[in-house]
From Swiss-Prot:
Catalyzes the conversion of inosine 5'-phosphate (IMP) to xanthosine 5'-phosphate (XMP), the first committed and rate-limiting step in the de novo synthesis of guanine nucleotides, and therefore plays an important role in the regulation of cell growth. HAMAP family: IMPDH. Its main location: cytoplasm. Signal peptide: none annotated. CDD domains: CBS_pair_IMPDH, IMPDH. It comes from the Eukaryota. It is found in: Cytoplasm; Nucleus. GO terms for molecular function: IMP dehydrogenase activity; metal ion binding; nucleotide binding. GO terms for cellular component: cytoplasm; nucleus. Residues 112-171, 177-235 form the CBS domain. This is Inosine-5'-monophosphate dehydrogenase 1. SMART domains: CBS (SM00116), IMPDH (SM01240).
């Protein structure tokens, strides 16, 4: 009894766990699985946790999630879905500049749509069906010249063409459209709120905005009203358009790609390199900042403070951290360079925060717990590839193998990706090599369903993780880590086994 009845009070609490500074002070490189976060005190519900975090110096996201610029992960469908959920998608550049710019071009989820598809009286029903197949909508305004700024004469909606067949494709729009005198319009200068109220009262699908000369200047869609209601966290720019990023290389011909992307409305460019500490990237940062000073630039990839310093000095607005830690990446194996991701994120974030530069943890994310750990180590956002691959919105077609529904997933350093386009070769400085050295592999991943179901699971998981830690926001989580209040503990291999599913003959692991 005497051994444990030392005091009648509970004022004494022994020191427990390690601060991040102590954990990463030794020479061991740690991954996310090598440590755990010790729980804190809960005095709030999980849904109260604020996940707002900085993507770059000037762009803030309500959800700290980014889809990776890989050709089996992010094109327009993924970027749209990620932005609607409060994150952002980075369109890959393993394609022509024109294709990438078209994927970025903003026509979805806007307040006032100032560049809609417009047709003239000389267009036919077939043209409308072609536009519907290409853009996914059929509410098309008709003007005298078929351009914005021309006199509005009508609109073609799905109700006008629903029951038409191929034999009607040659019919002119003047015969099927809803005429101007039947339309509800709003005057130029109307506020977005007023226009939305008019659209709600009219019960129409589209609301054209016209000037005093009855010329079309913009349009508003009812579907956008519904999206505003259904996606309150959506990432939008000052024009109420969804945020979108794009990756570019660091070579001379990437300057043409950059011009097309800025014309398409890109919000942030990611300089895509496996090793970002190079004269090529520094020169490209200087070029972008001189030509497009307001454009946000993400540099990388880096894993040390020394690498980060050069890019911060060059003027980057955020840093992408990770080298060789992705599930399809073999850089560490082939090149003998890289760093375990836990250590890389902590070391770079601890240095970059002194200059107000946010850090993106890129790679090595296998579970929602890894996301929480990356954020707790100082990352502002987390970039995911394999975790989002094989979702409905990821590029590529599903196929079946042994009865399992799969999608292809490959590293941008794989021979498959490098053979498709030279952009992947430039990322690994190998476009001029006679012999290509693969730094990635190709594989397949089981169908995960839609992003619209998977990302809410990730968001809820992050919130519950922060709740267990006792952090009501991501900014509080980081401040707890840097102040030493957040305590960590290394895990032995036995501890890792214990922390997973064990001791069962068989089991089913359903995450959501």
């Amino acid at each position: 009894m005497a051994d444990y009845l030392i005091s009648g009070g509970t004022g004494y609490v022994p020191e427990d766990g390690l601060t991040a500074q102590h954990l990463f002070a030794n020479s061991d490189g740690l991954t996310y699985n090598d440590f755990l976060i010790l729980p804190g005190f809960i005095d709030f519900t999980a849904d109260e946790v604020d996940l707002t975090s900085a993507l770059t110096r000037k762009i803030t996201l309500k959800t700290p999630l980014i889809s990776s610029p890989m050709d089996t992960v992010t094109e327009s469908d993924m970027a749209i879905a990620m932005a609607l959920m409060g994150g952002i998608g980075i369109i890959h550049h393993n394609c022509t500049p024109e294709f990438q710019a078209n994927e970025v071009r903003k026509k979805f989820e806007q307040g006032f749509i100032t560049d809609p598809v417009v047709m003239s009286l000389n267009h036919t029903v077939g043209d409308v069906f072609e536009a519907k197949n290409r853009h996914g909508f059929s509410g098309i305004p008709v003007t005298e010249t078929g351009k914005m700024g021309s006199k509005l004469v009508g609109i073609v909606t799905s109700r006008d063409i629903d029951f038409l067949t191929e034999k009607d494709y040659s019919t002119y729009l003047s015969e099927v459209m809803t005429k101007r005198d039947e339309l509800v319009v709003a005057p130029a200068g109307v506020t977005l709120k007023e226009a939305n109220e008019i659209l709600q009262r009219s019960k129409k699908g589209k609301l054209p905005i016209v000037n005093d000369s009855d010329e079309l200047v913009a349009i508003i869609a009812r579907t956008d009203l519904k999206k505003n209601r259904d996606y309150p966290l959506a990432s939008k720019d000052c024009r109420k358009q969804l945020l979108c990023g794009a990756a570019i290389g660091t070579r001379e011909d990437d300057k043409y790609r950059l011009d097309l992307l800025t014309q398409a409305g890109v919000d942030v460019v990611v300089l895509d390199s496996s090793q970002g500490n190079s004269v090529y990237q520094i020169n490209m940062i200087h070029y972008i900042k001189q030509k497009y000073p307001e454009l946000q630039v993400v540099g990388g990839n880096v894993v040390t403070a020394a690498q980060a310093k050069n890019l911060i000095d060059a003027g980057v607005d955020a840093l992408r951290v990770g080298m060789g830690c992705g599930s399809i990446c073999i850089t560490q194996e082939v090149m003998a360079c890289g760093r375990p991701q836990g250590t890389a994120v902590y070391k770079v974030a601890e240095y970059a925060r002194r200059f107000g530069v946010p850090v993106i943890a890129d790679g090595g994310i296998q579970t929602v717990g890894h996301v929480v750990k990356a954020l707790a180590l100082g990352a502002s956002t987390v970039m995911m590839g394999s975790l989002l691959a094989a979702t409905t919105e990821a590029p590529g077609e599903y196929f079946f193998s042994d009865g399992v529904r799969l999608k292809k997933y490959r590293g941008m350093g794989s021979l498959d990706a490098m053979e498709k386009n030279t952009s992947s070769q430039k990322r690994y400085f190998s476009e001029g090599d006679k012999v290509k050295v693969a730094q990635g592999v190709s594989g397949s991943i089981q169908d995960k369903g839609s992003i619209h179901k998977f990302v809410p699971y990730l968001i809820a998981g992050i919130q519950h993780g922060c709740q267990d830690i006792g952090a009501k926001s991501l900014s509080i989580l980081r401040s707890m880590m840097y102040s030493g209040e957040l305590k960590l503990e290394k895990r032995t291999m036995s501890a890792q086994v214990e922390g997973g599913v064990h001791g069962l003959h068989s089991y089913e692991k359903r995450l959501y």
